[in-house]
């Protein structure tokens, strides 16, 4: 039903595939339900103001991103857009819990910790995503710190905390 809603809301395929960097720097493709207009990544200037474009270049995030569709807002708020990533788990590219998979450009945001973070299999959710994914940015350094915290403290107990926090965030729509 989500696929039908996406196709009714805006033209284009309901699934989105993007290259990210997996464990040990291996390129992988992650799957998601499309939450933006179809040409959002190819032509962001069609949809964003100059201020929004500057924020995107700085933080890889935009407040009230105009490229996100109505259905996309709901899918993101409930994290339902991430469900297709279980295909990536079955393929062995992702784990359920780990640092979020990032683009090649974003890997450099980790600085000297880049190889350490990439030594861990990325996950559908993780410490950063579960604690404050909507409240921190690369520019603040908080995202890097939270992802590195997970890599350095991996345990069944921490995974359980991430799972519970993720579930609570999904219920609250954060």
Mark where each language-model region is:
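Short, glycine-rich, amphipathic interfacial segments at transmembrane boundaries or analogous
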Residues: 16-66, 125-146
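A hydrophobic, helix-centered structural microdomain
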Residues: 1-42, 88, 156-174
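Alpha-solenoid HEAT/Armadillo repeat architecture
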Residues: 61, 76, 149-150
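Hydrophobic structural segments characteristic of membrane proteins
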Residues: 5, 83-174
